[in-house]
């Protein structure tokens, strides 16, 4: 699996074994959904009051 790991959409890394999800974290309050954190995960991180987390399982989907 390949996941983006920076705010730039053309930079990505190959996830280590066991991390089969990509995630993207954005701030809920901003009108522009600029990712503040991206990467690989074994389980999907939880969203919070300020942060929205979206997970997916295909190459470069985050």
UniProtKB/Swiss-Prot annotation:
Q: In which tissues is it expressed?
A: Expressed by the venom gland.
Q: Which InterPro entries match?
A: Cytotoxin_Cobra, Snake_3FTx, Snake_toxin-like_sf, Snake_toxin_con_site, Toxin_cobra-type
Q: Where in the cell is it found?
A: Secreted; Target cell membrane
Write down the superkingdom of origin.
Eukaryota
SUPFAM superfamilies listed in its UniProt record: Snake toxin-like
Q: Does the keyword Disulfide bond apply?
A: yes
Q: Which Pfam families match?
A: Toxin_cobra-type (PF21947)
Q: Which GO terms describe its cellular component?
A: extracellular region; membrane; other organism cell membrane
Q: Which GO terms describe its molecular function?
A: toxin activity
Signal peptide bounds: none
Instruction: Tell me which UniProt keywords the record has, alphabetically.
Output: Disulfide bond, Membrane, Secreted, Target cell membrane, Target membrane, Toxin
Q: List the disulfide bonds.
A: 3-22, 15-40, 44-55, 56-61
**Hey, which family's this protein in?**
Belongs to the three-finger toxin family. Short-chain subfamily. Orphan group XV sub-subfamily.
Q: What else is known?
A: Is classified as a P-type cytotoxin, since a proline residue stands at position 31 (Pro-31 in standard classification).
* Described function: Has low cytotoxic activity.
Protein name as annotated: Cytotoxin 11
